[in-house]
Amino acid sequence: MNSHSPSLRCHAISLGCPKNRVDTERLLGSLGIPLTFIDYPNNADFVFINTCSFIHTAVQESVNTILQLVADVEELSEKPFIIVAGCFVGRYGEKILKKDIPEVDLWLDNKEIESWNEQILLALNIKSTFLVTDRIITTGKSYAWLKISDGCQHSCSFCTIPSIRGSLHSYSIDELVKESRHILDQGVKELVLVAQDVTAWGRDLPNNYGLKTLLDHLLVLDGLKRLRLMYLYPTGLTKDFLLYLKSVGEPFVPYFDVPIQHAHPDILSCMGRPFAKNPRKVIDNIRSVFPEAVLRTSVITGFPGETEGHHVYLSKFIEEIKFQHLGIFSYVAEAGTPAAVMPNQVGEKVKEQRKAELMEIQLKISEKWLKNFVGKRLSLIVDNVHPEWPELYTGRAWFQAPEVDGMVYISGPNIKPGELIEADIMESHSYDLVALADSY
């Protein structure tokens, strides 16, 4: 590759969760070279694919994406340099993958993430030309993810994350404040904090900082309009921490993403989450401090040993709690996890039936909740122009997280992505709202 190229054309693909997106953005910024991002691989100098392998479907998506990319460039006279990184490489190993997919030029294990940039520059035979190598934000000016730690201290019996990502590694306050300032200086309005367990941040640092210490540094930053916390492990939401969040007020938004995984204590014990086996208490604590709280959770249906009685228990729990947002996943046995070899595995048809029943319950909850906003005036962050109707925009109220929740479809004059606007809610649908904005 030409080491004197003024700008390299990069086609970047980030699979999986927002944490992967942050890794991709940090990596591309850390290369310290001028990059032009293009939508298709055909004209790229290099392609970077950051993979996921958390569950079987993520593994399959990673494999399909790599093979499709290889097929897309196969007939080109000048093929792009293909780089594949991330959890998929860490889980299956470069040696095996290199043999199975020889068309990939460079494999990068997620355990070597600190040296990804050096390995890429060496492989491309180029040198950094920038003194400042800040993260490249790819989500526009409305929001950005802030990954505050990697790895996990928990031992959930169904999860591959500790074996792939390792134990907890918190990023320092200085690193995160610097990165946040860089993000906000670009006009971004909302920071969304993510990790395998956001509440665990700082436990591995020398001074055993708690999350409150980090938030004290972030909430005062100029330009921050919203701060959202995702991936909150139930036991990390102590009454003391909730009272702290109440005291700080805006720009923190009382949106709580608390993955409970199940409601029945027997199943939670089998999941290796015995300390989280009273989700009702956690939710009651949240609502006692924040009556206006919006709750998101995720549950796994069809876990080994889940009986019809356990399923009914979970169904009634969801009906009673009325989570505003709910992710429902059918259990998948992941090789190497304790749950994969547990007795009483649930059949696929039963899993899918139970999932469908839970989704029907949640649909009714969501429809009823969203009807309450019709006729009200809300503050919205505008995310994007609608891909099919250029006079329509998509955005979010404070109670909607990017990419995982529903959205607000906005029409009106002089609207721009990245703006905070006031709009009247005109309609509600199953998971989305429709709004009309004022003239600006």
From Swiss-Prot:
Residues annotated to bind [4Fe-4S] cluster 1: 17, 52, 87
Q: InterPro entries from the entry?
A: Elp3/MiaA/NifB-like_rSAM (IPR006638), Methylthiotransferase (IPR005839), Methylthiotransferase_CS (IPR020612), Methylthiotransferase_N (IPR013848), Methylthiotransferase_N_sf (IPR038135), NA-bd_OB-fold (IPR012340), Ribosomal_uS12_MeSTrfase_RimO (IPR005840), rSAM (IPR007197)
Catalysed conversion reaction: L-aspartate(89)-[ribosomal protein uS12]-hydrogen + (sulfur carrier)-SH + AH2 + 2 S-adenosyl-L-methionine = 3-methylsulfanyl-L-aspartate(89)-[ribosomal protein uS12]-hydrogen + (sulfur carrier)-H + 5'-deoxyadenosine + L-methionine + A + S-adenosyl-L-homocysteine + 2 H(+)
Top enzyme class of this protein? transferase
On the tree of life, the source organism's domain of life is Bacteria
Q: What is its EC number?
A: 2.8.4.4
Cystine crosslinks: none
Q: Which UniProt keywords apply?
A: 4Fe-4S, Cytoplasm, Iron, Iron-sulfur, Metal-binding, S-adenosyl-L-methionine, Transferase
Question: What region holds the Radical SAM core domain?
Answer: 138-368
**Cofactor binding note of this UniProt entry:** Binds 2 [4Fe-4S] clusters. One cluster is coordinated with 3 cysteines and an exchangeable S-adenosyl-L-methionine.
Q: Where in the cell is it found?
A: Cytoplasm
- GO biological process entries: tRNA modification
Q: Does the keyword Protease apply?
A: no
TRAM domain: residues covered: 371-439
Q: What does this protein do?
A: Catalyzes the methylthiolation of an aspartic acid residue of ribosomal protein uS12.
Entry protein name: Ribosomal protein uS12 methylthiotransferase RimO
Source species of the chain:
Lawsonia intracellularis (strain PHE/MN1-00)
